[in-house]
Amino acid sequence: MFSALVLAKNGYRPLIFERGSDVDTRHQDIEKFWQGGQLKENSNVQFGEGGAGTFSDGKLTTRINDSKITDVIEAFVEAGAPPEIKYLHKPHIGTDILRIVVKNIREKIKALGGEIFFNSQVTDFIIKDDKICGVEINHKEKFTASDVFLGIGHSARDTYELLYSKGISMEAKPFAIGVRIEHPQDLIDKAQYGEDYKSELLPVADYSLTYNNRQKGRSVYSFCMCPGGQVVAAASELGRVVVNGMSNYKRNSGIANSALLVNVTPDDFGHNVLDGIAFQRHYEEMAYICG
């Protein structure tokens, strides 16, 4: 999305192919799924306009020290994000506002000459003489291009498989796997702030925990802690369970949650490029079977 925005601002007319739905249709599909409806494999918490980030809580934390981060923050504010993200130490947009921001960025790209195609999955890469020449969409239409930006995320497993089948250079890398844990927000507030934890001057509290077993080379740590948020069903494949955490702007649900993760490496799941995906699917299926 930001690649397209930068290109459009510099006089190009990018074409964006999104395998999922626009953010409004996507929101409806997700709400139906959360209420017990059928999962739509291309319109869910992972896939659709804005990617998985649209249904996160919009924490804008990074360890990267780069001047371009300011440009990203400015673009968010121009699209409707809270102005305080420019100066807060832990800037936060909120899922409810992110949906508006994503839509406004889309309209900005279109106003600058870009085009966006929803429900348009890249099903093949057209390669000639080791150079990208275009993409195939939905096994039908072909578009020529001298440059292709692939915003693949971590859930487009079929696209990883496609890249592998095309002989694209890839390698397995470590990642983390775990669960989501919930607590009453008051419990976390009191632990962090003490007896004055109910003061209206204080924001809802968060936390970060890490344990490192140096002998075994294994770490357990909290990740993406969502104060005043909720745990959400985030699967993108039938018969599997995935969860995520998110918070709206006001963070007022009364429930805190965090991922609790352990690192895994190719020594755990195998050194073939796609072994990590098989490892993930195995545990997602086990969670589904367990209910």
Describe each PLM feature range.
Residues 1-291:
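Residues forming the flavin
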